[in-house]
Design a protein with these regions (language model features):
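Radical SAM enzyme [4Fe-4S]-AdoMet core and its adjacent flexible, acidic
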Residues: 24, 28, 36-38, 43, ...
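Flexible mid-to-C-terminal extensions adjoining Fe-S/redox cofactors in radical SAM and related proteins
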Residues: 175, 179-245
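Conserved SAM/AdoMet-binding glycine-rich loop
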Residues: 1-37
Length: 245
């Protein structure tokens, strides 16, 4: 089960309601807030998200979180083409200006709106160059730390430990091994969280980390129903609209 004294709770969000809810969430025990930034340019970000004004609200929300003492960050998803266009560098500069503590970089996964991007499966060639590009920022105290899921899930770190040392909880209470996995293992509105977590973390495919990259981007792992549960977005529910974090 989860030891509340040895675990942390992170919120990854599009940032729409953070400014209004940050104080209440702090009282509830939330430790960290990460807002998704898809582009440093507000218009480009809002067009991608389909929500006018979202970029501005996300920045206001993260500034509110900073004022309340949260650990804060940007989460950015990079496709190979966005990386080549210099978007990561622009987002890092924005993060420096805002004053967040970290930029967490996800390499685009073949799920959600990218579920048709089969070119992202078993494609690691561009990731090392992107990871190494952050070294100057990480040596400069003026910048936030820049971390990469691709590094963490590699043989140089802990490997892909989704469902092993962490899980994702959807806005509707569904527990998944991570926010990119379609498969649901239970709902906290229907049974205790610890019970679902124990069931998930003792499955053979999740009882230990997988070295060498993310399960969702691995062709062999994706054959498992517990890793790639159909074609629906990982946020879709039969009784709820799809959401994008």
């Amino acid at each position: 089960s989860v030891d509340k004294d040895r675990s942390t709770t992170l919120l990854f969000t599009n940032g729409w309601a953070v400014e209004e809810q940050a104080k209440e969430l702090r009282r509830a025990g939330l430790d960290s807030v990460f807002v998704s930034i898809d582009a440093a340019d507000p218009q480009q970000h809002d067009e991608f998200r389909g929500t006018p004004g979202l970029h501005q609200r996300a920045l206001r929300g993260i500034q509110r979180a900073l004022s309340l003492g949260y650990s804060t960050g940007f989460s950015a998803t990079m496709t190979p083409e966005a990386w080549q266009a210099g978007e990561l560098q622009r987002i890092i500069e924005l993060a420096k200006g805002v004053g967040v503590h970290e930029v967490f970089v996800f390499d685009a996964m073949p799920t959600g709106r990218y579920k048709a991007r089969t070119d992202l499966v078993d494609n690691h060639d561009w990731l090392e160059e992107m990871i190494q590009s952050a070294a100057p920022y990480n040596r400069d105290d003026r910048y936030p730390g820049v971390t990469f899921l691709a590094y963490m899930s590699s043989h140089r770190s802990v490997g892909c430990s989704c469902g092993t040392s962490y899980f994702y909880l959807s806005p509707y209470g569904d527990m998944m091994s991570c926010d990119f996995n379609h498969a649901k293992f239970g709902n906290v509105l229907e049974e205790p969280l610890w019970q679902i977590w124990d069931r998930l973390s003792t499955l053979p495919e999740f009882c230990q980390a997988k070295w060498g990259g993310c399960k969702i981007k691995d062709a062999e792992s994706r054959k498992l129903q517990t890793v790639s549960d159909g074609d629906r977005s990982c946020h879709d529910r039969d009784d709820q609209p799809a959401m994008t974090n």
